[in-house]
Amino acid sequence: MAAAGGGAAAAAGRAYSFKVVLLGEGCVGKTSLVLRYCENKFNDKHITTLQASFLTKKLNIGGKRVNLAIWDTAGQERFHALGPIYYRDSNGAILVYDVTDEDSFQKVKNWVKELRKMLGNEICLCIVGNKIDLEKERHVSIQEAESYAESVGAKHYHTSAKQNKGIEELFLDLCKRMIETAQVDERAKGNGSSQAGAARRGVQIIDDEPQAQSGSGGCCSSG
């Protein structure tokens, strides 16, 4: 059943397509998180992402179909200048740090500033402390991380790609927030300005019936 006040776009027979970008330093486990979520795979060896990789996931959340396009970006310093290419038109951003690495948490703050500067408050932010399987080696306090996330309007999560903890909850909650944001835009679009607010973020609201098999084409709306 559509959420109250969700409008016509939340009705049955339609799908949302959202773009999500993962940002963070190298070695914090961004690729491991995405592979665990999309393919339920985990590799103990470090996987280095060169520039960016792209995966998709289809979901049904409360009767609403969601097509996720997930961009996993490189963490190495030499690739940071490419960030705007990948997070442009994103509906959500997952900013990952390693709970055993204080510097990786501080670098997340730089990404938050950049995203807010480039995309304003229209993007849904998640700050994620990964590798909680190494809790005994933690160097980032839970209170500090959660307080910071709240101060910048983000939600904070803890995950372990190795143990498959917290990842489903992270993506599910982010999807719900992106749907809510899109619905606010739909309600605010006004007479005759169809999907104007959603278009600002690159949200695609698709009539599934004539293009039920074309979800992959609608996933990658990077403008």
UniProtKB/Swiss-Prot annotation:
Family: Belongs to the small GTPase superfamily. Rab family.
Motif (Switch 1): 41-54
Cofactor: Mg(2+)
BP terms from Gene Ontology: anterograde axonal transport; intracellular protein transport; positive regulation of dendrite morphogenesis; positive regulation of early endosome to late endosome transport; positive regulation of receptor-mediated endocytosis; protein stabilization; Rab protein signal transduction; regulation of axon extension
Lipidation (S-geranylgeranyl cysteine): C219, C220
Name of the gene encoding the protein in the UniProt record: Rab21
Free-text note regarding domains: Switch 1, switch 2 and the interswitch regions are characteristic of Rab GTPases and mediate the interactions with Rab downstream effectors. The switch regions undergo conformational changes upon nucleotide binding which drive interaction with specific sets of effector proteins, with most effectors only binding to GTP-bound Rab.
InterPro entries: P-loop_NTPase, Rab21, Small_GTP-bd, Small_GTPase
PROSITE patterns hit by this protein: RAB (PS51419)
Name the record gives this protein: Ras-related protein Rab-21
Catalytic activity: GTP + H2O = GDP + phosphate + H(+)
Organism, as annotated: Rattus norvegicus (Rat)
The protein's assembly and partners: Interacts with the cytoplasmic tail of integrins ITGA1, ITGA2, ITGA5, ITGA6, ITGA11 and ITGB1; this interaction is dependent upon its GDP/GTP cycle. Interacts with RABGEF1 (via VPS9 domain). Interacts with ANKRD27. Interacts (in GTP-bound form) with VAMP8 in response to starvation; the interaction probably regulates VAMP8 endolysosomal trafficking. Interacts (active GTP-bound form) with TMED10; the interaction is indirect and regulates TMED10 abundance and localization at the Golgi.
EC number: 3.6.5.2
List of residues binding GTP: 26, 29-32, 43-44, 46, 48-49, 75, 130-131, 133, 161-162
Placement of sequence motif Switch 2: 74-92
Topology class, membrane: Lipid-anchor
Localization per record: Endoplasmic reticulum membrane; Golgi apparatus, trans-Golgi network; Golgi apparatus membrane; Early endosome membrane
Residue positions assigned to the propeptide: 221-223
